Amino acid sequence: MKISEIAKFLGIEYYGDDIEITALNSLNNASFSELSYCDGEKNSKKIASSGAGAILISKEFENLVSKDCVKLVVDNPHLSFALLSKLFAKPLISSEKKQSNIAKSAKIMPNVYIGENVQIADHVVIMAGAYIGDNVSIGEYTIIHPNAVIYNDTKIGKKCHLLANCVIGSDGFGYAHTKNGEHYKIYHNGNVILEDFVEVGACTTIDRAVFESTIIKQGTKIDNLVQVGHNCEIGENCLIVAQSGISGSSILGKNVTMGGQSATSGHLEIGDFATIAARGGVTKNLEGARVYGGFPIMLQKDWLKFQAKIITAFRDKHE
């Protein structure tokens, strides 16, 4: 799509070079044929090093855009990006017919849907009612249980277990908002990558990335009823217990343990070998090799002392 067409769609004037834009991407990873956006002071620091061919930008930060990059000045870059994301969204059902490659040793049970250009390796088992979208690849000895949904472009390693009714690769919870309180969907063009030996519990959901990939690294085990948001990166050999919620763009190091009903607020990092006790609410970056608990999050030993003081104070008041 030409820059002039994008400008017309957004209702803004543009008189510069009419370059071709092929996709949307983040400031960090965009190439010259891709468009990105900057929605605030925090991200404005990334503009100088961005390789994007065009950037949606507010008037406040337009002077930060280099002469080699097209700047499209809009009132709300995030909203404009959301509107454009629909134009660049990949189709849910491909019109392009590409034969899938299914190993002879794979076992596919009845009522399984397999899309276009799917790669299924040796000794894979896919149980009844599963949905496998276009361009999915599944490594050897992986088992996909009944009614699991694997959306387009998902990459699954070897010897993974995906239990019943899990959903891998659906759109994340991303919206831009108008001044009147209307919400516009951000279409997600990334994917999900599950590395080798990953287990995903029943009714767990892992959202695809807006750009690039949501990644679950080798050996991680995820319990039932867990939500992993878009663009998360879960390190090697993590344990995530039932009903936990990992908000978008959270990064967990290796061997992190998330106790039952624990959660992160998103856009933060948890260090290697950290443990979050049940119902812990993580709202900031955490160092590794420590045990945390409570809300707001603190060292678990401090949280227990705090709880003991509350109980003592309450008891003394009523004696």
Curated annotation (Swiss-Prot):
Q: What is its EC number?
A: 2.3.1.191
Q: Does the keyword section mention Calcium?
A: no
Alphabetically, the GO molecular function entries are: N-acyltransferase activity
Q: What class of enzyme is it?
A: transferase
**Annotated catalytic residues:** 230 (proton acceptor)
Q: GO cellular component terms? A: membrane
- Record's catalysed reaction(s): a UDP-3-O-[(3R)-3-hydroxyacyl]-alpha-D-glucosamine + a (3R)-hydroxyacyl-[ACP] = a UDP-2-N,3-O-bis[(3R)-3-hydroxyacyl]-alpha-D-glucosamine + holo-[ACP] + H(+)
| Pathway of action | Bacterial outer membrane biogenesis; LPS lipid A biosynthesis
Q: Which Gene3D superfamilies match?
A: Hexapeptide repeat proteins, MurE/MurF, N-terminal domain
* Record-linked CDD domains: LbH_LpxD (cd03352)
Q: What keywords sit in the KW lines?
A: Acyltransferase, Lipid A biosynthesis, Lipid biosynthesis, Lipid metabolism, Repeat, Transferase
One GO term (biological process): lipid A biosynthetic process
Q: Spell out the InterPro entries in the cross-references.
A: Hexapep (IPR001451), LpxD (IPR007691), Trimer_LpxA-like_sf (IPR011004), UDP_GlcNAc_AcTrfase_non-rep (IPR020573)
Domain of life of the native organism: Bacteria
* Family listed: Belongs to the transferase hexapeptide repeat family. LpxD subfamily.
Q: How does it assemble?
A: Homotrimer.
Q: What is this protein for, i.e. what is its function?
A: Catalyzes the N-acylation of UDP-3-O-acylglucosamine using 3-hydroxyacyl-ACP as the acyl donor. Is involved in the biosynthesis of lipid A, a phosphorylated glycolipid that anchors the lipopolysaccharide to the outer membrane of the cell.
The record's annotation in NCBIfam families points to: lipid_A_lpxD, PRK00892.1
Know the name of this protein?
Answer: UDP-3-O-acylglucosamine N-acyltransferase
Tell me the organism. Answer: Campylobacter lari (strain RM2100 / D67 / ATCC BAA-1060)
The beginning of the lineage is: Bacteria, Pseudomonadati, Campylobacterota, Epsilonproteobacteria, Campylobacterales
